[in-house]
Amino acid sequence: MAEQKRNRREEILQALAAMLETSPGQRITTAKLAANLGVSEAALYRHFPSKARMFEGLIEFVEDTLLTRINMIMDEEKNTLSRCHAILQLLLTFAERNPGITRVMTGDALMGEHDRLRGRMEDLFNRIESSIKQILREKAMREQQRFIVDEAVLANLLLSYADGKISQFVRSNFKRLPTEHFSAQWQVMEQQLISA
């Protein structure tokens, strides 16, 4: 029974993500979501007490996926720039593979929803920025080199790049892929980081 309930919850979240992808700029109502799934709104509320909880389910997926992978990168990669590259690539690739959820990441799908949802996404991006800042600060210990520019400034620059590419993806209705030109752009950023 619990497995069936979890499967239904996942099905609801997948349908919500798909609707966010195919209906850019439109607000998703529980009535539209229920109709898309072929169930009643009451059936949705048996699995989620509110639409905000549905969005929280998507946010939890984003948090779990990204933070788990970032921790893996921290364990597997030892070089500062390789770690930064891997985290940026992770963010861009995740967004590209999950267009509907990307609208949640940018806050686009959360307009008019509960403020705590946007706060959770902001907190996630702050945590990612803190991870990047920590990586940059560890360079002094790992590689016996420090950056000339403050690590907080560099971490913000790197995250802003990814945030901008993800926002561009949403604004273009998912036509401008976040990974477009990433290799060439990373080479420029890497050279700047080496001299920073």
Curated annotation (Swiss-Prot):
HAMAP family: NO_factor_SlmA. The keyword Coiled coil applies. This is Nucleoid occlusion factor SlmA. Residues 6-66 form the HTH tetR-type domain. Belongs to the nucleoid occlusion factor SlmA family. It is found in: Cytoplasm, Nucleoid. Signal peptide: none annotated. The gene is slmA. Keywords: Cell cycle, Cell division, Coiled coil, Cytoplasm, DNA-binding. It comes from Idiomarina loihiensis (strain ATCC BAA-735 / DSM 15497 / L2-TR).
